[in-house]
Structure formats: structure tokens, C-alpha cells
């Protein structure tokens, strides 16, 4: 089907340069869309629907569940196990076959359960479209399915409606729209119909409304300019569909480790097969069983399950700290994060507009307090003595004006938490008046002019203690034009525009937004109030400077992140000056300069890559800008975390290595696209999550260092046995018992290790740094060889004493499990003495020790388990022998740690 071009980007005939619909007059837009105020005819609408397609977002069919499950068998180490299972089946060793196949299925199930269904986030966007729309067709009002809307339709909007398509407004009646899902800014937007100038970001296109946003007050009429995939919401949907999530550092490292193990296994098996055929007269069945045992021994089958256990414990810990992890590997990725890109409103700030400064004709004041709680004093600027508000003063008159000319109310819930009803600006003024504790007066509202986006002020006629007064609050530039006088301590004096403009500029540099107030006396006989009544006689009183203040805990959290080598970047839809001011208060490193979305729009990829590193404040940004910034940082080798709450943030969250959604004000779309959800919308939670992520990575590394020597020792034992012509020391099922049962159980103890003291004072690990670094390889080789040599000596001591192969294998099993247990304690620290680290405080170690002892008693002494695993009951003295060997190994490893500590620190 041929699609109509997006009308927002077409050029009317005769224009010499493309003009966007927000830059055109209402008549020009109607002409461009070939529409009229009376609406389209049914025939014209049907033709356009056939040409443009339905007003719906395209759906992409996801992979079926069974195919996603099978994808988890696509791993080189799983191939080794499947081949081993096939060979044991051919040889008739059905117990071995079933156990090996069971291991592969368990690993696949774990991976399948972890896998997130990314299509949910796209479905969430589709669910944001309204179901019906009121339109003007055939000269009359009709209600039609939203899917049937076409460019050129005239749509009627009312309070509470969800906007069904992108529209250019042709008529407004104090229309206010909530656009936070697209812009990220929580304040409602007052809409107009006038044409606008310039290449404006979405948040400044105040003569348009966008699909998925909500009408919060009054109503209006608009002409549809884009539907379906051509809308701003559709554009976000397309970006989401085109993003492929990066693999986490942990998964990349595990892939590399798996391929390295596979290469070693293959080389060893081929070499041993050739050697045994050429130099040893070993029956083919026994040789194949030995090689299968070698393959099973070398594969760390329990590692995926163990990693999942450790990550799951991290998830539970983070949940208690108000961070919900949606995808397990995110826990580890948090520890590798090098950059956090954060939204401003509500995440770094309190999302509670607060008055911080007062400007009057005589002086300026600063105001305490950072929330809606009416606690805080007023100070004369430069003084530490609080001001007592005296009746009849300029300050008292100004405070009384902002209190009475106000539609908001201060509220307190059953928990004692303070809030407001009404808009945030009026709420901030109401809170300030409450802080001042003004003496009670008898006030009665006589008439009111509600706030209107066209006039940019509201006004009331009040009777206050028997006097009539007109009060007005609004935009300073508008009220300036109405005033010829200003109130000072000497009474009414001529208005001094230069003074007010200079003071406003000074406070604007601090990121404050301005609201002005004025008043004039009125007649007690007056019962109405209109705009003409405000054109003369107003006396200017003063200006409130307000801001959404930083969260106190966010300041500490940013400092903690920067100490940990994580750079914090603020990406916001707010104005640059406000963003820089908040950035300086928060302590963001480079907050003296800001990059705007307009500047980003005109950068090529090379310039953007440089700007992404150089700047820490990005203002007036769009979804595309956020997405490009994340990609640019990733191309520079950064591991990027990105916060967001609106639909506009979803593409960047999905692209980021760690997408972080807000749980309170975040949309469902954003939460589905994210890897982590903050239940308190607090940046400080990110810092604590980074600490937990680093702890988890440390414990994962300890676990891998714990598991690998056992696999190496098992493999070396089998190789030595083949070379020496001895019995197979370990059968595949015994190897799987150690790799899946005992290793997993003991690893659980390491999962409970607390974070090391310097965990947030070290830089993030380098991108691409492998978990198996040089010292890790040395430790695995040293410990694995030591265990193998000890087991070989033990086997050589047992063999001449006439014991059965099953008895010898049982003693070797117990010796290897004991070695695992003592080495698990060694692994608590890579260089410190393990018994000096609060062994009694880690209850997990004692729990797994008890479970391990029970498991070994069952496999050695229960007849059913003896027949399944080929074990025999052991006399008590052999438990003592294996324990002595284990203690000796523990001491050797502790000595090795002491000797190599100096080399590790200088490496």
C-alpha cells in the first residue's frame, strides 16, 4: 500500500522553503491538508484512509516461545555435553545420558526464564492510543474509531481526552495538555493557535498536540497532520523496533570463556585419542568413556546455575533497597557502568516547585525549605536573621496577594506528608505564604479572571477586612506592561523597569523561574472583573523566583558515583540555564556549560562523539537526541546507564546498557523497556545499586575462581589415568555430581560475601577486561594442579591395598569435595587471610557446609544413591584422611596468596 508523506514535512505549492506545520497559520495548514473547519466528507476520508493506512502503530511478530527456548542450546559447551550424551547413549550408559541431558535442559530453562520479551514495550506504546475520537465530518459531529482518523480530519478535544493523533490546533479554549510522556517535563502546557517561528523542539510547539498525550483542562479543536507511524509516538515506536539490545559484559565474558574451554577440550581429546590408539592398548569403549569423562569434567556445567543464583540474590538485595531488576545480568552490568545519563525532574530534583527568592522594590529575600512542607524562614539577602513579616509592609502585601490570587490548596495526608492541589507554580506560592504565617484576615472572593495562556495571568477581586482590592499574578513581562508604579517602603513610586530586569537576570542565572504580582484598590460596589479593569492603576509589588530543588540525597549519590569513577550526565527537556544551575547545585563535574538539542541536531557523528564526552549537561533534548547520545557514548567504549520516565525515554533506555525507569511517575512503556525500575524515583538508589552490582561482580569472580580449579583437577586426573593406563578415576555421573551439586552448593556461600571496603573508591573495571585475568589463570592452574597431584598420590596409595574401583572413586570423590570446601573459604579474598574476614558473620558458609555434609552422607551411604553413582560406604578414617589433605591445601593457598600479593599490586 502506498503511504502519504507525513504532512508535517510537506511544502505548500509556491513556498520556496519547507515550513513545518507549527510555523504556518491555521489557514495555511488547512490548505496544506486540503481540509476545512467543517471537516472532511465521508468519501474523502475513506479515500485518505485507503491511501494513508489506519491510524495505528505497525506490529512486529515476535519469535515463538519454543524457538526462544531452543536458542539457549546454541552454545559451544552445550554442544560438548550433547555430544557426550549421545555417545553414552550409544554405549548404553543410560544413567550418564539422562544426567547429562538433564543438565543441558536445566541450563536452557534458566536462560529462557531470564530472557525478557522486548515486544512488551512496543505493545505498551500501542496501548497508549485512544480507542475513539470525536470528529467533524460531513458538517456534523461524529464519534469514530481512532484507527479511522486520517490527515485533514477535524478533531474536537475535551478535558480528560487522550489525543488520538498529531494535530495542529485551530481553536483553543484555555486548552492545557499533559505532555510528560513525550517531553519528560511534568508541568502542563498551555496551548495556543498562533503560528510559531524557528525550528522548535517538541516541548515548545505549543500550537500542536501529540498522539498519546492527555488533555488536562478545557478544550479545543485541531486538524490531524499525522497518523499512525508518522506521529511522534509512531516515530518512537519505530526507534524502539530498530534497537537491538547490547549483550552485557558478563555474557560477553562468559562466551569468551566458553569458547576458550571448548578449544582446550577439543585439543586435549584429539591428542589423547591419538596417543591412546598409538601407544596404549585400551578398549575402544573404555577409551570413549574416558574421553567423555574428560569432556564432562572440563565443562563447568554448574556455572550458569550458580551465576543465576548469585545474580538472583543481588536482585533480592536491590529490591529491598527500592530497585527492581527486570533482567538478571543487569545486576552485574551495574557494577561495570562508567556513565549515568539522568533525567532532571523528579530524579535529581524533588519535582516540587519551591520559591527560593523574593524580589521587591526595596530589597531581595531568600527563602528556606525545599518541599511542599510549609516549614522554612525568610531572610533578607546577605543576612542570617529571619525576617518577621509586619502588617502593611511591601512584603506582607505581596505575600497576601500570592496567597489569595491562587487556585491551589495545601494538603496533608494521613501519613503527615504535604502536597498541593492545582498547578505546581501556584502551589509553590501557596506554600510560601504558609511559611510566612501571615496573620488571619477576613477575605472574600468576589470575582475572578482564570489563568489564560493567551493573557498569561490570573486576577481576582477580593474584599479584605472591609477593603476591596484587585490582585494579579502572572508572567513578569506581561504585568510590567500594566504597571506605572511600584510599591516601596515609601509608598507608590514610579516603576523602574531596569531594576526589575537586572534582578530577574541575576536570579535567572541561578535557574529560577519568575512569577510577578501586583494589586490596586477597587470599589466595594464592584461585583465583576474583566481584562479592561487591569489596564490602569496597577501597582507592582514584587517577583517570586522559584525552582524544582535538587534532592539532598542526590547530591551525595552523585558525589559517590564520581568518586567511583562514574561520570554523571544530566539530559533534560528543560532550559539550558536552569539545567546548568541545577547541575552546579548537584555537583555535576562540568556544569558550567550546556549543549542544547538544537546544537546536537546539527552535529555529525564525529562531532557528537566528542560532545558526548566533553559535556555533562544536555538541555531541550528530544528522544532522538537521547538515543544518539547513548550510542555515541557506547561507541566511545562507555558502559551507559540511562534514566527515564516518559515514552520519549523508552528508545534510549532500550539502547543503554542499563535502562533505568522511574517506578512512580514512569509509564508502563518505559518500565517494559528498562532493565531496572526505581520504586522511589530517586537517583540515590542508583548509587546504592552500583555498589551492589560491584559486590555481585566480585562474588561472581570469586565463584569462577572457585569452580575452575576443580574442573581442571578432574581433567588432569583423567589425563594422568589415561597416560598411566590406570582405571578411570571419576565417572561422568560423579563428575556431574561435583560440578552441579557440590560446586553449586558451596558457591552459594560465596554469594553472601559482603562488599569489600574499597568497592566504591575504585574505578569501574575496563571495558573488555576478562574475568580470567593473568592472576586468575595462575590461581586456577596452581590450585587445580595441586588438587590433581594430591588426588593422584591418594589414588596411588589406595590402589595396592586391594580396594575396588568403586571404593577408590568414592575416596577420591570425598577428597575432591573436601578440597572444594576448603578452597571455597580461600576464595573469600584474593589476597587477604580468609579467616580474618568475619567468617562467623557469613552465615551462608556455615549453611552450605551443613548441606554439603548431608549430601555427601547420602551419596556415600544410601544404597539407592550408591547404585546410581557407583559409590561405596567409607570407614570414618578415610573422612579424616581427606580432611587432613584439605586443611593442608588451605594453608598452601593462603601462603601462595601472601607470596603473590606484592606482584598483584604492581601488575
Which role does the model predict for each range below?
Residues 794-797, 801, 805, 817:
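C-terminal substrate-binding/catalytic lobe of Rossmann-fold NAD(P)-dependent dehydrogenases
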Residues 734-738, 806-815:
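Loop-to-helix transition at the N-terminal end of transmembrane alpha-helices
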Residues 827:
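A C-terminal functional module that forms or caps the active site or interfaces directly
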Residues 1-761, 771-772, 785, 796, ...:
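Conserved cytosolic headpiece of P-type ATPases
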Residues 742, 787-788, 810-824:
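Generic alpha-helical transmembrane segments
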Residues 766-785, 805-811:
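Membrane-water interface at loop-to-transmembrane-helix junctions
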Amino acid at each position: 500500500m502506498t503511504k502519504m508523506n507525513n504532512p508535517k514535512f510537506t511544502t505548500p505549492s509556491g513556498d520556496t522553503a519547507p515550513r513545518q506545520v507549527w510555523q504556518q497559520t491555521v489557514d495555511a495548514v488547512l490548505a496544506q491538508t486540503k481540509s476545512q473547519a467543517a471537516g472532511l466528507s465521508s468519501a474523502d476520508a475513506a479515500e485518505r484512509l485507503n491511501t494513508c493506512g489506519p491510524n495505528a502503530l505497525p506490529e512486529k511478530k515476535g519469535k515463538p516461545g519454543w524457538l526462544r527456548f531452543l536458542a539457549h542450546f546454541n552454545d559451544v559447551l552445550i554442544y560438548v555435553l550433547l555430544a557426550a550424551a549421545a555417545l553414552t547413549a550409544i554405549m548404553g550408559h543410560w544413567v550418564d545420558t539422562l544426567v547429562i541431558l538433564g543438565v543441558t535442559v536445566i541450563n536452557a530453562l534458566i536462560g529462557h526464564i531470564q530472557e525478557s520479551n522486548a515486544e512488551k514495550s512496543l505493545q505498551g506504546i500501542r496501548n497508549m492510543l485512544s480507542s475513539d475520537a470525536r470528529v467533524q465530518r460531513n458538517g456534523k459531529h461524529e464519534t469514530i474509531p481512532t484507527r479511522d482518523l486520517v490527515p485533514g480530519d477535524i478533531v474536537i478535544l475535551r478535558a480528560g481526552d487522550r489525543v488520538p493523533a498529531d494535530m495542529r490546533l485551530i481553536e483553543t479554549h484555555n486548552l492545557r495538555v499533559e505532555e510528560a510522556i513525550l517531553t519528560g517535563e511534568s508541568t502542563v502546557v498551555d496551548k495556543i493557535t498562533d503560528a510559531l517561528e524557528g525550528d522548535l523542539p517538541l516541548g515548545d510547539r505549543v500550537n500542536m498536540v501529540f498522539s498519546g498525550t492527555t488533555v488536562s483542562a478545557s478544550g479545543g479543536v485541531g486538524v490531524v497532520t499525522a497518523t499512525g507511524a508518522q506521529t511522534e509516538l509512531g516515530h518512537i515506536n519505530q526507534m524502539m523496533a530498530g534497537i537491538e539490545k547490547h549483550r552485557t559484559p558478563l555474557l560477553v565474558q562468559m562466551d569468551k570463556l566458553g569458547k576458550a574451554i571448548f578449544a582446550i577440550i577439543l585439543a586435549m581429546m584429539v591428542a589423547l585419542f591419538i596417543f591412546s590408539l598409538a601407544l596404549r592398548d585400551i578398549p575402544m569403549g573404555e577409551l570413549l568413556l574416558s574421553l567423555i569423562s574428560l569432556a564432562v569434567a572440563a565443562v563447568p556445567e554448574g556455572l550458569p546455575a550458580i551465576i543465576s543464583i548469585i545474580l538472583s540474590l543481588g536482585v533480592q538485595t536491590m529490591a529491598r533497597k527500592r530497585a527492581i531488576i527486570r533482567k538478571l545480568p543487569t545486576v552485574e552490568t551495574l557494577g561495570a557502568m562508567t556513565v549515568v545519563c539522568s533525567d532532571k525532574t523528579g530524579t535529581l530534583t524533588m519535582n516540587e516547585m519551591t520559591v527560593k527568592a523574593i524580589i521587591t522594590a526595596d530589597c531581595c529575600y531568600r527563602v528556606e525549605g525545599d518541599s511542599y512542607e510549609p516549614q522554612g524562614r525568610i531572610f533578607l539577602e546577605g543576612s542570617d536573621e529571619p525576617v518577621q513579616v509586619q502588617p502593611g509592609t511591601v512584603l506582607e502585601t505581596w505575600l497576601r496577594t500570592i496567597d489569595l490570587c491562587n487556585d491551589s490548596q495545601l494538603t496533608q495526608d494521613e501519613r503527615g506528608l504535604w502536597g498541593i492541589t492545582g498547578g505546581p507554580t501556584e502551589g509553590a506560592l501557596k506554600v510560601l505564604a504558609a511559611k510566612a504565617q501571615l496573620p488571619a484576615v477576613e477575605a472574600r472572593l468576589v470575582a475572578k479572571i482564570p489563568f489564560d495562556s493567551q493573557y498569561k495571568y490570573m486576577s481576582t477581586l477580593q474584599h479584605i477586612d472591609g477593603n476591596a482590592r484587585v490582585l494579579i499574578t502572572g508572567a513578569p513581562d506581561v504585568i510590567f506592561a500594566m504597571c506605572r508604579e511600584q510599591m516601596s517602603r515609601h509608598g507608590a513610586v514610579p516603576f523602574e523597569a531596569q531594576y526589575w530586569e537586572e534582578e530577574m537576570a541575576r536570579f535567572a542565572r541561578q535557574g529560577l523561574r519568575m512569577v510577578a504580582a501586583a494589586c490596586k484598590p477597587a470599589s466595594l460596589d464592584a461585583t465583576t472583573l474583566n481584562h479592561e479593569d487591569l489596564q490602569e492603576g496597577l501597582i507592582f509589588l514584587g517577583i517570586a523566583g522559584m525552582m524544582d530543588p535538587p534532592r539532598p540525597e542526590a547530591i551525595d549519590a552523585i558525589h559517590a558515583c564520581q568518586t567511583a569513577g562514574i561520570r554523571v550526565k544530566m539530559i533534560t527537556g528543560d532550559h539550558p540555564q536552569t539545567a546548568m544551575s541545577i547541575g552546579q547545585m548537584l555537583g555535576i563535574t562540568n556544569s558550567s556549560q550546556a549543549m542544547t538539542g538544537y546544537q546536537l541536531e546539527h552535529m555529525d557523528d564525529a562531532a557528537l562523539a566528542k560532545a558526548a564526552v566533553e559535556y555533562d549537561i544536555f538541555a531541550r533534548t528530544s528522544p532522538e537526541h537521547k538515543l544518539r547520545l547513548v550510542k555515541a557514548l557506547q561507541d566511545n567504549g562507555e558502559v551507559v546507564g540511562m534514566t527515564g520516565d516518559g515514552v520519549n525515554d523508552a528508545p534510549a533506555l532500550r539502547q543503554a546498557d542499563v535502562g533505568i525507569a522511574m517506578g512512580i511517575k514512569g509509564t508502563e512503556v518505559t518500565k517494559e523497556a528498562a532493565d531496572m525500575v526505581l520504586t522511589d524515583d530517586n537517583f540515590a538508589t542508583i548509587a546504592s545499586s552500583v555498589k551492589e552490582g560491584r559486590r555481585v561482580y566480585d562474588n561472581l569472580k570469586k565463584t569462577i575462581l572457585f569452580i575452575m580449579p576443580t574442573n581442571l583437577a578432574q581433567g588432569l586426573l583423567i589425563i594422568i589415568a589415561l597416560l598411566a593406563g590406570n582405571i578411570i578415576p571419576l565417572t561422568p555421573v560423579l563428575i556431574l555430581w561435583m560440578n552441579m551439586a557440590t560446586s553449586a552448593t558451596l558457591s552459594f556461600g560465596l554469594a553472601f560475601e559482603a562488599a569489600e571496603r574499597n568497592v566504591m573508591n575504585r574505578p569501574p573495571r575496563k571495558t573488555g577486561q576478562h574475568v580470567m585475568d593473568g592472576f586468575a589463570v595462575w590461581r586456577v592452574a596452581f590450585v587445580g594442579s595441586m588438587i590433581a597431584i594430591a588426588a593422584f598420590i591418594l589414588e596411588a596409595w589406595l590402589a595396592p591395598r586391594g580396594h575396588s574401583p568403586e571404593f577408590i572413586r568414592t575416596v577420591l570423590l570425598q577428597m575432591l569435595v573436601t578440597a572444594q570446601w576448603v578452597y571455597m573459604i580461600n576464595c573469600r579474598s584474593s589476597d587477604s587471610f580468609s579467616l580474618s574476614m568475619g567468617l562467623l558473620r557469613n552465615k551462608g558458609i556455615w549453611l552450605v557446609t551443613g548441606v554439603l555434609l548431608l549430601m555427601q552422607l547420602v551419596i556415600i551411604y544410601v544404597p539407592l544413591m550408591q547404585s546410581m553413582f557407583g559409590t561405596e560406604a567409607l570407614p570414618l578414617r578415610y573422612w579424616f584422611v581427606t580432611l587432613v589433605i584439605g586443611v593442608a591445601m588451605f594453608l598452601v593457598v593462603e601462603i601462595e596468596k601472601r607470596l603473590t600479593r606484592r606482584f598483584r599490586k604492581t601488575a
